[in-house]
Every structure is written in structure tokens, then in C-alpha cells.
Amino acid sequence: TRPKVVVTPESQTWQTVGKPEKKVDAVKLVQGKPAFTADMDARGMLYAKVLHSPHAHARIKKIDTSKAKELKGVAAVLTYQDIPRVVYSTAGQSDPIPGPLDTFSLDHKVRFVGDRVAFVAAESPEIAEKALSLIDVEYEILDSILDSRQAIDANAIRIHDEPEYVDFGDSNADKNLAAHIRIDIGDEKKGFAEADEIFEAEYEVPKVQQAHIEPHVCV
């Protein structure tokens, strides 16, 4: 038997649903009065900058931070050699698609353009930016993967070859597979057999964020 759809009658006691809500901070926002995280300036505060990789896939053969450390106003310069090597997941979701442990704060290998290479903390954003330009990095350029079909090819290079990698669910580093999920609704074979027309196509979707709630600034 097919499930019965029950429609809940509209409740007259609702105070918010279906009614306009006043934006209590609208006036202050248009006047520029509220202080956001990036507006805070504590006494003696340092400013951090990140050196990003220009390469999609490479190993760091050598990294020289001596000139950056000598720059006046620089408090610290960190590379993968200076911090604990702790693997973690950047995925915020859990089952049915848990993320594998495949990320390090800093690593001797970069896996995408923009990957983190070094951190700098300085007395001003300008000094920190200057320090980044003084860091000398020698890369061993590796073959890169720019297409998802290429990534899952049997002969594709392995992006995550680190021994610390931890699989979750159907993820598989050997196949460059971060996650896999299949959802079937109804009798698929019967549906195809009874269909008057069958349309086949491939669809590619960009990376999306449904709710922008994660912080992008911290003090």
C-alpha cells in the first residue's frame, strides 16, 4: 500500500512562520557601526598570513625561511618541519559520507593549487605579506589530476600516498576516492523496463555550500 500523505492544518498560534520579521540590526549595519571579528584589534596582536602553493601537485624539496625570520616585525615562521604531524578530516558531515583523514595543517607535499606551504605571524599584515615573499621554496613538480574521470582511472597517480591516511566508509586512496554513496528509490530495473523513453546524460556540479556558517576569521 502507498503511504498516505497527511497535511497538517495551518496553526493560528504560529508567531513567526508566514509572518515578516524585523531585522533588528539593519540600521546599525548600514551605518557601519557593528564590529565584526576582522575589525577587532587587540593590543600587541599579531597578524597571520599563509603561503599558498602555486602548483597542483608537488613535493617540497627545500624550504628556506631564514630571510623571512630576519625581517623586522616578524614573530614566527612555521613550516611542516615546525609543527606536529597530525592527520585530520576537513569534512563536517558524518554518515553516510564521512570524510577520510587526509589533511595536515602543513605537509611536505602539496595536493592542489592554494594548498598551505607556510605560516607567518607578524606585527602587521604588510610585514607578514612581505615575509611571505622572502620564503624560498624548491618544489619537485609531480603529475597532476585535473579531471574526475582521470582521477578514478586504474592507472591514475595517487594523490594521497601518505601512510597516515585513514579510510572511512567507501573512501579509497588508491583510487583517489574520497567518498561513495548510492541511493536507489523504487524498483530501478522495473522503471527502465516500463519507461516509454530513457534519457542518459552526464552531469557535473560545482562545489557548493548550503549554509555559510563556518568562521573565516579568528582572533
Predicted feature residues:
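A short, compositionally biased domain-edge/stem linker segment
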Residues: 35, 184-186
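Flexible, low-hydrophobicity surface segments
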Residues: 1-171, 198-201
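Histidine-centered active-site/metal-ligand motif
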Residues: 57, 176, 180, 216
